[in-house]
Amino acid sequence: MLFACAGALAQQSQGAPPEQRESFDPSRDAAKDIQAALRQAEASGRRVILDVGGEWCIWCRRLDSLFASHPEIEEYRRAHFVTVKVNWSPENKNEQVLSHYPKVAGYPHLFVLESDGTLLKSQDTGELEKGKGHDPEKVMAFLKKWAPSK
């Protein structure tokens, strides 16, 4: 029964568009997710954020919590970016995909891409922290700095 439920969840997760997924999933094809996100970004005049991390990562969960508890920041992010969660964990380090980007020193790590795939920014999220979480003002400033001009 447990395996049947896990299989159903995996199928459901595989079909969800990249920006609608809320968790890091080692079974995802990150390369396909990024390509889909680039197409969405191109069609909608947005940029792409690659959010690299894993479910094991407390700071990844804290960053997710910031977006969940600050709807104005989440709305701004969704209006200007297509966000793709790229899993990094023992089950799937996504080495092939991540080899195209600068080395990641810690998690979560954010890459901002233009809709054509050009890397614009490699962001260590430690710089966005304050105390035991991420600073809403710093995160919003980061998003505003890298949002496309409309």
Model segments located where?
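Conserved redox-active cysteine motifs that mediate thiol-disulfide chemistry
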Residues: 54-68
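N-proximal helix/coil linker or "cap" segments that precede and/or mark the start of modular domains
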Residues: 10-28
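Short active-site neighborhood of thiol/selenol oxidoreductases, capturing the structured segment around
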Residues: 44-55
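A short beta-strand-turn-helix
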Residues: 26-46
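Non-catalytic, surface beta->alpha helical segment in thiol-disulfide oxidoreductase systems
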Residues: 105-150
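Sec-dependent N-terminal signal peptides of Gram-negative exported proteins
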Residues: 1-12
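Structural alpha/beta surface segment adjacent to cysteine/selenocysteine redox centers
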Residues: 92-105
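Thiol-based oxidoreductase modules, predominantly thioredoxin-like and allied folds used
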Residues: 28, 68-93
